[in-house]
Amino acid sequence: MTYDINTIYTKYKQLTKKQRQQLLAALQSQGINIVKIEAYEYTDAPGIKHLFFYFAEDSRKAIPYFLLDSEVWEKILQAIYRY
């Protein structure tokens, strides 16, 4: 699946708090133990956007979207696109 991070970032930011909680629950039900998703835009470089993921195994370690396993990233994309 192809993606544009700006589109995914915007779509995620538009989710309500309840939808974000539902998204996490849906991913967890698929065995993806994400406890937090952080949408981040660099203040000193406007337009550069990232999504960081925090997993239950080490909830203090932020993993950028581009370092995720491709299968996990595909499932996350599909889940976000459902909203």
Describe the predicted segments one by one.
Residues 26-77:
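Acidic, low-complexity, intrinsically disordered interaction modules
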Residues 2-25:
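Negatively charged, low-complexity tracts enriched in Asp/Glu with abundant Ser/Thr
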Residues 80-83:
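Short acidic DE-rich linear segments
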